[in-house]
């Protein structure tokens, strides 16, 4: 999955970018308070993308 597609799904679900690290970005879902690291690669493997979406309740 492309990183921009994953970020679009996160924004639609109400998540926001908390901060940018050197290798990862931290996204937070204010509804459940969970923060998840999203790697800064153009292509993110499907299992990892599904895990991130599931943890942030963005499925």
Q: What do these predicted regions represent?
A:
Residues 1-19, 28-59:
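Basic nucleic-acid-binding interfaces
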Residues 22:
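Cytochrome P450 catalytic-core helices
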